[in-house]
């Protein structure tokens, strides 16, 4: 447990600023709070004295890896360096704010962000996942937006590992319980199983919010005399030290047991009321600046608001409503109790602000005010326990240039190619391979998980189930909508971090494009092992550069993101897992492209893009041989842009009736998923001379399966030829068939495919 949570409730002497100045040699447990020797010395230099116990707690959480980005900041600057003015044109808020905000036209803006809650979700899976959803939702609320949807990227240990059942069950129930209670549709995501995540599951939650552009709010405190109001839930002992104890350190042999008190406890019904309360406060023009309380609690909210503003701030910490008796100042300041917000309000609007809160039965208290100075001063029953320059807490923490070194094992890993593995040749062998992949935890149906989420609440979900990207209607009068997708591949990123990050970007970009939407912006969550490992830092720096360069090539900006380090147990790190989220815009959701076949009688099936013999890092290599080595598929971002442009035009002109991107499992998996989604069979005729195994199972990037109405085949083929996009006819949709047939090789009934796919997760977790 956190040293903060172990401090006595009552001490003989309150450690005030005055007391600290007169007791310079008093021992302090800075190491237990996660601070290094040089960091503690720097705090003393900043203050000109030793810090009080409360100041020490504040600096320790705000200078943690989770809050300060001290190991990643120097590398994350590359995102800004590679973002052109043209890419910035549509951004209303970017990196550094609670969430990025993008202009989508017609006066509308969309804010979206993905964040991790990995470590808490291993310690206490239900609350860890639930509060992960709650935290990202409040980030979106703090921008002035109404949250409209969530997504999740989940990584667990092997499906048959004993602890995976505990973690998955809690995480899925936590996500569903919180999101469903908020009335937010869960419109997509991804679930991956790999032994490397056994002690370090990844729970990355994304939230999307919508606002009118004039309703944008930012996190800053300005105007001397303006009041600071804390509103929402009471403050308790839950979550204390979460950012420094859980999110900024590795698990040891003791695992999670000693860290349980650091997990927050969520109340989705309080948050649901808080959303409506915030929206009414915004509509009434009652808020100058606002910040949610997440990691580091009031330490973060007060220091960031003051640092981003043009003055100082005073806080009466004993005014904070508590739900635990005899909390110390440090505990109140660092508590991560959920469902709380902090607003800057003009004195003339305080009564109106409090009246709105009373209407919604939201507890609200004036706890301080903005000053014309340059200090953040916090008192406890009239005595000063914090007196610091806020920028040194929030924005000028330590920045490290960690050692970076390509792992000695990388060459051997890349030389271990999958070409040595035995491949299926006959029709029976190919059929068995298809069923083996479909019946593995890696490619089986996720219905067991997704059916625990409400996908269509609020009535604006247009695409969710079976779709590559989730789609929402934003404006009922015009049909304007958005599409969102998140993707990652730790296996590819291990083989080549630069290319792996670009492959994740390319797939998320392509998943948005196949819905008919135009990709416009990116968010990310970078999940890696310990930054103190030079090999991990090499993976991280390569992935950042790959993602930034890829966004520059595609012409879409990174609007914000999150870094999660220390995802390892002892010396065993997770696969490097950069999660990429892409936002797209569509002018009318009625022209969306679904995944399922059979919308039109006798559709022609066409494969767009080039197929190469690329199996290194593939699901086929993983399932059939437990192999991971070689080089990932080639990334061609110019081809991805071309593919997206063709799909957008085809959607606008009604040339395509269904589309599905090709990724894990290749063409065979895409065909099966589209056939099952449409409950319609099809007949595949492979091009003469093609290697059936390569064409069916290769994971080459930049490819899409499309269904084209018979009447539009020549037009669509002509458009592809005119733009230089390879398009090959590979079969037809057979509405009278109940099977997927690969002519001359094998056939599998839809019933067998569905049974194989849907039986897997219930077998492990039901």
Curated annotation (Swiss-Prot):
Keywords: ATP-binding, Cytoplasm, Ligase, Magnesium, Metal-binding, Nucleotide-binding, Purine biosynthesis. It is found in: Cytoplasm. Its EC number is 6.3.5.3. Gene3D superfamilies: PurM-like C-terminal domain, PurM-like, N-terminal domain. Mg(2+) 1 binds at residues 115, 562. Substrate binds at residues 116-119, 138, 264, 336-338, 564. The active site is at residues 66, 117. Pathway: Purine metabolism; IMP biosynthesis via de novo pathway; 5-amino-1-(5-phospho-D-ribosyl)imidazole from N(2)-formyl-N(1)-(5-phospho-D-ribosyl)glycinamide: step 1/2. It is an enzyme of class 6 (ligase). It catalyses: N(2)-formyl-N(1)-(5-phospho-beta-D-ribosyl)glycinamide + L-glutamine + ATP + H2O = 2-formamido-N(1)-(5-O-phospho-beta-D-ribosyl)acetamidine + L-glutamate + ADP + phosphate + H(+). It comes from the Bacteria. GO terms for molecular function: ATP binding; magnesium ion binding; phosphoribosylformylglycinamidine synthase activity. GO terms for biological process: 'de novo' IMP biosynthetic process; purine nucleotide biosynthetic process. Its main location: cytoplasm. Mg(2+) 2 binds at residues 139, 292. One of its GO terms (cellular component) is cytoplasm. ATP binds at residues 69, 113, 524, 561. Belongs to the FGAMS family. Monomer. Part of the FGAM synthase complex composed of 1 PurL, 1 PurQ and 2 PurS subunits. Part of the phosphoribosylformylglycinamidine synthase complex involved in the purines biosynthetic pathway. Catalyzes the ATP-dependent conversion of formylglycinamide ribonucleotide (FGAR) and glutamine to yield formylglycinamidine ribonucleotide (FGAM) and glutamate. The FGAM synthase complex is composed of three subunits. PurQ produces an ammonia molecule by converting glutamine to glutamate. PurL transfers the ammonia molecule to FGAR to form FGAM in an ATP-dependent manner. This is Phosphoribosylformylglycinamidine synthase subunit PurL. The gene is purL.
């Amino acid at each position: 447990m956190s040293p903060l949570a172990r401090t006595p409730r009552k001490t003989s002497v309150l450690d005030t600023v005055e007391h600290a100045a007169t007791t310079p040699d008093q021992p302090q447990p800075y190491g237990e709070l996660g601070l290094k020797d040089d960091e503690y010395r720097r705090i003393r230099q900043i203050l000109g004295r030793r810090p009080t116990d409360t100041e020490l707690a504040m600096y320790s959480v705000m200078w943690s890896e989770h809050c300060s980005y001290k190991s990643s900041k120097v590398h994350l600057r590359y995102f800004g360096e590679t973002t052109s003015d043209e890419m910035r044109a549509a951004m209303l808020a970017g990196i550094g704010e609670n969430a990025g905000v993008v202009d989508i036209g017609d006066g509308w803006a969309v804010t979206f962000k993905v964040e991790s809650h990995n470590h808490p979700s291993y310690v206490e899976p239900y609350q860890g996942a639930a509060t992960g959803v709650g935290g990202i939702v409040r980030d979106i609320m703090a921008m002035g937006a109404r949250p409209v949807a969530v997504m999740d990227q989940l990584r667990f240990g092997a499906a048959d590992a004993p602890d995976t059942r505990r973690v998955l069950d809690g995480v899925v129930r936590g996500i569903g319980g919180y999101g469903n209670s908020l009335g937010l549709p869960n419109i997509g995501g991804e679930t991956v199983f790999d032994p490397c995540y056994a002690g370090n599951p990844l729970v990355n939650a994304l939230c999307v919010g919508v606002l009118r552009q004039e309703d944008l709010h930012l996190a800053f405190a300005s105007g001397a005399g303006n009041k600071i109001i804390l509103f929402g839930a009471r403050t308790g002992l839950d979550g204390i030290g979460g950012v420094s104890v859980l999110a900024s350190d590795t698990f040891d042999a003791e695992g999670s047991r000693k860290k349980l008190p650091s997990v927050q406890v969520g109340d989705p019904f309080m948050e649901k009321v808080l959303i409506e309360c915030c929206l009414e406060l915004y509509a009434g023009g009652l808020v100058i600046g606002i910040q949610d309380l997440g990691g580091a609690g009031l330490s973060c909210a007060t220091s960031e608001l003051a640092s981003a503003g043009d003055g100082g701030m005073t806080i009466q910490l004993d005014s904070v409503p508590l739900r635990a008796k005899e909390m110390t100042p440090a505990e109140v300041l660092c508590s991560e109790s959920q469902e709380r917000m902090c607003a800057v309000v003009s004195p003339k609007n305080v009564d109106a602000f409090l009246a709105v809160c009373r209407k919604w039965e939201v507890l609200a208290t004036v706890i301080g005010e903005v000053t014309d100075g340059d200090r953040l001063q916090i008192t406890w029953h009239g005595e000063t326990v914090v007196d610091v320059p806020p920028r040194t807490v929030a924005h000028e923490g330590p920045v490290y240039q960690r050692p970076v070194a390509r792992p000695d094992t990388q060459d051997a890993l890349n030389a271990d190619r999958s070409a040595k593995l035995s491949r299926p040749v006959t029709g029976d062998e190919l059929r068995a391979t298809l069923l083996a992949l479909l019946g593995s935890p890696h490619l089986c149906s996720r219905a067991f998980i997704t059916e625990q989420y409400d996908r269509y609440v609020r009535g604006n979900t247009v695409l969710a189930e079976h779709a590559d990207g989730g789609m929402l209607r934003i404006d009922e009068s015009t049909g304007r909508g958005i599409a969102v997708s998140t993707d990652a591949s730790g296996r590819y990123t291990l083989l080549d971090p630069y290319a792996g990050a670009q492959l994740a970007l390319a797939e998320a970009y392509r998943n948005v494009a196949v819905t008919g939407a135009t990709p416009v912006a990116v968010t990310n969550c970078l999940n890696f092992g310990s930054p103190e490992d030079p090999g991990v830092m090499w993976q991280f720096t390569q992935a950042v550069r790959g993602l930034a360069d890829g966004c520059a090539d595609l012409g879409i900006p990174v609007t914000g993101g999150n870094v999660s380090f220390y995802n390892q147990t002892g010396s065993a790190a997770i696969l490097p897992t950069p999660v990429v989220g892409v936002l797209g815009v569509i002018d009318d959701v009625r022209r969306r492209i679904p995944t399922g076949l059979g919308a039109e009688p006798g559709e022609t099936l066409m494969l767009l893009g080039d197929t190469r013999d690329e199996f290194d890092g593939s699901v086929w290599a993983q399932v059939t041989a437990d192999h991971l080595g070689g080089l990932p598929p080639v990334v061609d971002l110019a081809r991805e842009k071309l593919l997206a442009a063709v799909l957008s035009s085809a959607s606008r002109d009604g040339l395509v009736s269904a589309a599905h991107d090709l990724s894990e499992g290749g063409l065979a998996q895409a065909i099966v998923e589209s056939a099952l989604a449409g409950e319609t069979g099809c007949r595949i005729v492979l091009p003469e001379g093609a290697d059936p195994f390569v064409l069916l199972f290769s994971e080459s990037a930049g490819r899409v399966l499309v269904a084209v109405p018979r009447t539009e085949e020549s037009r669509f083929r002509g458009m592809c030829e005119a733009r230089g996009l390879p398009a090959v006819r590979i079969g037809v949709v057979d509405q009278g068939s109940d099977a997927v047939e690969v002519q001359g090789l094998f056939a599998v009934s839809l019933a067998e495919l569905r049974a194989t796919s849907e039986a897997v997760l219930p077998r492990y977790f039901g």
